[in-house]
Amino acid sequence: MALALSVAPTSSSLSSLLSRTPNPSPNFRTTHLNFGSQRRIYTINPLLRSFKCLQSSSRDVNASPFSISAIASSSSSSQTTELVPYKLQRLVKEFKSLTEPIDRLKWVLHYASLLPQMPESSKTESNRVMGCTARVWLDAELGQDGKMRFCADSDSDVSKGMCSCLIQVLDEASPVEVMELKTEDLAELNVGLLGGERSRVNTWYNVLVSMQKKTRRLVAEREGKVPSFEPFPSLVLTAHGIEAKGSFAQAQAKYLFPEESRVEELVNVLKEKKIGVVAHFYMDPEVQGVLTAAQKHWPHISISDSLVMADSAVTMAKAGCQFITVLGVDFMSENVRAILDQAGFEKVGVYRMSDETIGCSLADAASAPAYLNYLEAASRSPPSLHVVYINTSLETKAFAHELVPTITCTSSNVVQTILQAFAQMPELTVWYGPDSYMGANIVKLFQQMTLMTNEEIANIHPKHSLDSIKSLLPRLHYFQEGTCIVHHLFGHEVVERIKYMYCDAFLTAHLEVPGEMFSLAMEAKKREMGVVGSTQNILDFIKQKVQEAVDRNVDDHLQFVLGTESGMVTSIVAVIRSLLGSSANSKLKVEVVFPVSSDSMTKTSSDSSNSIKVGDVALPVVPGVAGGEGCSIHGGCASCPYMKMNSLSSLLKVCHKLPDLENVYGGFIAERFKRQTPQGKLIADVGCEPILHMRHFQANKELPDKLVHQVLSCESKR
């Protein structure tokens, strides 16, 4: 339902922002705010359709923490007619009039002294502002006159002063005015403070985002809207245990503590038969839980993204492993087989986990006739370079490379690959595929770079400038008919719920997600509250933020929204538990949130007496399907059905049967490509070359001469 906000025509963008805001969770109850000794309770009545200033009786500013405007100006704030932009302009003018950093710091500290004291009862976990180096609390109320009031506090005087400045601007503003202010509007307040400048910048931004989140909720409550959905399922980790919230989280959590007998069985057979295991992050949680536990007893187990899997297999072969089991989709086992052969380990057996095709929607898209047509168009436009996502078959890479010189990429190196290609060949045309969302996100990223300075662009790539970025954009193409079915699920509904409930949390997003989720995470990234990239980038980001919080050694609640396949949680939990375990006295809470479609939610019991324990995980009993995930791929859970074909039972069966002299599991073997390309070459040989080009780029930070020659040779033959 739309919020009952009536805005001027110039506020159409804000109107659309608030036009379909979901209702808050039942867990978020209306807070009655304390004003001195008097408790003021507002009834929940529908707001007027316009938040025009309604004159009300003067407040006792000495009795309320929501009174910064009255203290900071010579006249009563309830009588002011100043607009938010004018207040901000005046604040910026004050700030910029001070040229010395020490004077600006004193100015911020002066504002800190103006901030009314916040009641201790308001310094709650729900009022903490995430992403600030210091502890910051923010509370808000929506007055009966339709105006917002804020109060804040911090254990840092500098952060407190920043809060005071923002409250000076937004106190007694209408909800629309609060929502219209953007983080970019605060840019001129960012320069020249002493020490920790980047973290200080983030305080401005994160407090503003929290103000806007509270404003949304208060407006919804004032309109009398009944909450219509639960929070997304999540896992909450502390130094002392794990709590699973929601049925999907329950299903994930119950495998974090596998049966010792299963772990022992796997370790014994791996050791006995010298078997290595390479598995993708997106594995089923059951098999990941066992593999994670088994890693402590057998070193030749690797859980990683697709790029590292083949490298790990080579390392295992060098260490004496005679077999490699691959837990992933078919193009991953193909790559492992081909790279092992290239490294001279033809005798090492490679096994998949099924005798059926373990497909991938992206790999399938690259094998379709439409992709061949796309490449044929590229071949007619030399000099062209085909940048193909590593998540494609070896056959696709081989056929493509014969049509257009090709280099593979990953979600973590695709941007640098493209920038380097244009730097080495300025007249180049780049054709990326097959992931349409990633392609669109790359283009959007480069478009955002056109708003940067030359210095900022050079920090991303030293051989590029504003002119070169503008020049390359018309010559950057991407395939528009390929998507990952998992990341496709992060669409409009999920994004709207994240905006409403988790806009102040840390947001993570794989580069394959749709544009709305990409933009949301990119905005968070600007204030160091988000990451967009590969699965490994996401894992590293979470690890960094948790480590920083552990080092601060204060009570805190970090919340991460997992914008990729839910199978990542096993590796994430392992990293977080390791960091929290290093500080047994830590009061830190880390929450990992799984964005799930509302169609796939199952209500859980709120009665703690009905919970059960698995290891140190408290699992609520789920009414109905207690043993199920409570959601499915069709309902919108970020879970890949292809990856889930790699079960623990399959892994154990294959391992026990090896060396399979009777060929019982012949259908599980990752076969070598004996077929030839149209030019009569082996698919394995030609398909590996784009991968080797990428490896050269990663090692040397430039495209190999051989690839550059291939691209320019096509131009000379034109």
Swiss-Prot record:
Q: Where is the composition biased (Low complexity)?
A: 1-22
Q: Which terms does the record give in the GO molecular function aspect?
A: 4 iron, 4 sulfur cluster binding; enzyme activator activity; metal ion binding; protein homodimerization activity; quinolinate synthetase A activity
Q: Where is the transit peptide?
A: 1-70
Per the entry, the cofactor note is: Binds 1 [4Fe-4S] cluster per subunit.
* Residue numbers spanned by region Disordered: 1-29
Q: What class of enzyme is it?
A: transferase
Catalytic residues in the record: 132 (cysteine persulfide intermediate)
Where does this one sit in the cell? Plastid, Chloroplast
Where, in this chain's numbering, is iminosuccinate bound?
A: 280, 306, 389-391, 411, 510-512, 535
Effect of deleting the gene: Embryonic lethality when homozygous.
Q: Which InterPro entries match?
A: Fe-S_metab-assoc_dom, NadA, NadA_sf
Q: What does this protein do?
A: Catalyzes the condensation of iminoaspartate with dihydroxyacetone phosphate to form quinolinate. Can complement nadA-deficient E.coli mutant. Essential for the de novo synthesis of NAD. Also participates in cysteine desulfurization mediated by NFS2. Can activate the cysteine desulfurase activity of NFS2 in vitro.
What's the miscellaneous note?
Answer: The highly oxygen-sensitive (4Fe-4S) cluster at its NadA domain, can be reconstituted by its own SufE domain in the presence of NFS2, cysteine and ferrous iron.
The record describes its quaternary structure and partners as:
Homodimer. Interacts in vitro with NFS2, CpNIFS3 and AO. Part of a Cys defulfurase complex.
Q: What is this protein called?
A: Quinolinate synthase, chloroplastic
